């Protein structure tokens, strides 16, 4: 299915791609807004050998999943901004308890700089003093840690966004400040299992990310967002290969694909172009392959330079690491 799509819709570089890894894949970062749409579109994931999926939910809809698919999914619950900012520590901790009682073992925070725009414009709540390390959130971290849950966090965005979107810095803050803010949480809660979305938001800062891995043994990352990973990995190919070799046990593969309205109008292109981008990036030695979907932040155009990772590393990031990481919960 996927190769037929490539031949009919994509440039020749994506046809009959060499495949190093032939085993099952675990997509460790997706979003489900419509669970029945996710069921309907599961065949596209299966075409890329995806057998397990971690899906982030905004509502308690896991129970609506068809019984025969229960073993295919692990679910996380999104902690909504309105609830996070209730200013009632007991309420926030109780919310974690509620999610836990419903069977959720992963709690997601979305704390990228755009968050402050949403909170101020939609919720009409000033956020000048709100940080990840604010005492306001301590009850949440403590409860997550005590219950042995996983904290999934997106705390930052690509460097290019800070240069072009997040201006002035006086309003949004710097990327380094945001990374330091999350590190304070890691320091205070060393036993909390933390999954940093999108390579911990640090594919551009491998030295700092490596230091985090060396310092915080319960910190892991997913390599989700084909656009972001392809752009940044390709620009520092040699360094990222060495990084994967050194930290292959701490990296999970994911896509950040959403089963929602975006996935209704351009099917199966939405899925297959991202999957094949990862295949070129991780499994081949192809160089200078044009990214098959837009990258608005990179005006010069993004080309994918394959890392040609060895099978041992691919086995870990595609499957073994996620199985081991999520088995803890």
What function would you assign to each model-found segment?
Residues 26-30, 52-55, 74-77, 107-109, ...:
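Hydrophobic faces of well-ordered beta-strands that scaffold small-molecule active sites
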Residues 17-19, 42-47, 62-74, 94-104, ...:
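Acidic (Asp/Glu)-rich catalytic clusters
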Residues 46-51, 137-173, 177-193, 206-219, ...:
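N-terminal/domain-start segments enriched in small and hydrophobic, helix-friendly residues
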Residues 3, 9, 35-36, 193-329:
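H/E-rich (His + Asp/Glu) clusters that bind or coordinate divalent metals
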Residues 1-72, 90, 321:
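An N-terminally biased module of ancient metal coordination in phosphate/nucleic-acid-related enzymes
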Residues 38-39, 65-66, 88, 96, ...:
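Distinct, well-ordered alpha-helical segments
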Residues 59-165, 171-173, 220, 225:
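Active-site gating/metal-coordination segments in enzymes
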Residues 31-38, 53-62, 82-91, 117, ...:
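Acidic-and-aromatic substrate-binding clefts and catalytic sites of carbohydrate-active enzymes
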């Amino acid at each position: 299915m996927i190769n037929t799509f490539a031949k009919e819709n994509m440039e020749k570089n994506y046809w009959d791609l060499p495949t190093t890894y032939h085993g099952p894949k675990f997509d460790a970062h997706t979003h489900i807004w419509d669970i029945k749409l996710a069921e309907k579109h599961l065949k596209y994931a299966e075409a890329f050998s995806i057998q397990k999926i971690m899906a982030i939910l905004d509502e308690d809809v896991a129970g609506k999943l068809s019984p025969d698919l229960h073993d295919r999914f692990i679910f996380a619950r999104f902690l909504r901004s309105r609830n996070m900012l209730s200013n009632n520590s007991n309420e926030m901790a109780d919310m974690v308890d509620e999610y836990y009682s419903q069977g959720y073992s992963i709690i997601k925070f979305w704390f990228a700089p755009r968050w402050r725009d949403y909170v101020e414009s939609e919720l009409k709540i000033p956020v000048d003093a709100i940080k990840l390390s604010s005492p306001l959130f301590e009850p949440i971290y403590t409860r997550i840690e005590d219950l042995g849950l996983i904290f999934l966090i997106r705390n930052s965005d690509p460097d290019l966004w800070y240069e072009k979107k997040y201006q002035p810095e006086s309003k949004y803050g710097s990327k380094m400040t945001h990374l330091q803010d999350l590190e304070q949480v890691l320091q205070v809660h060393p036993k909390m299992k933390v999954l940093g979305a999108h390579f911990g938001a640090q594919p551009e800062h491998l030295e700092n990310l490596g230091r985090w891995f060396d310092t915080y043994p319960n910190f892991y990352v997913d390599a989700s967002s084909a656009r972001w990973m392809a752009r940044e990995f390709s620009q520092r190919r040699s360094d990222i290969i060495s990084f994967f070799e050194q930290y292959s046990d701490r990296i999970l593969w994911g896509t950040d694909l959403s089963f929602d309205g975006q996935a209704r109008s351009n099917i199966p292109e939405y899925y297959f172009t991202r999957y094949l981008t990862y295949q070129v990036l991780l499994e081949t030695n192809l160089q200078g392959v044009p990214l098959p979907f837009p990258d608005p932040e990179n005006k010069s155009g993004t080309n994918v330079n394959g890392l040609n990772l060895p099978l041992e590393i691919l086995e870990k990031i595609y499957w073994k690491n996620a199985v081991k990481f999520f088995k803890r919960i």
